[in-house]
């Protein structure tokens, strides 16, 4: 028997190496992957559903004031109910990159009100105007995402503002952060002569059925 034939026989008997299974890249979402979250926002959602902060705002923070709010509620959970802390006035622009969040933020909020589909009733606009006068120093910014932003909001006033908005079918939920901030639509839906399809029923269904669902909110 030659060396070549022996080598060939050994090679034939050697089992093939099993193929390694390719690991699926984690998405960083604990509810999707069932793995450790990749960032703090996902970790915080794992510990407590995002919208749970609403009740704490009503029961605790609006009564005990800004200083009672823990950091992990202030960001990101407040974002998910439509509020950012405002930046302090008069800060040197060159120094802002070196300051901490606590040094940058003021004890007031910007609240973003959703206008899904770019549609709002006259009663809704009137309510926003009244809230602006009473609680937001007459501020109201219309954004290119079809939302309205109010500034200088005190935590003590937030429950009252939410209640007034709810009376006219408006809210601030999912207004800020990496969330579906608004459902864009045409403000002339149902009116434009060249319209192919009126998207308002779909927008309304998404707003009522999907957005409040905790399975999607978290």
Model-derived features with residue positions:
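Iron-sulfur (Fe-S) cluster-binding modules
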Residues: 1-109
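Small-residue-enriched alpha-helical segments and adjacent helix-cap loops
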Residues: 2-7, 108-218
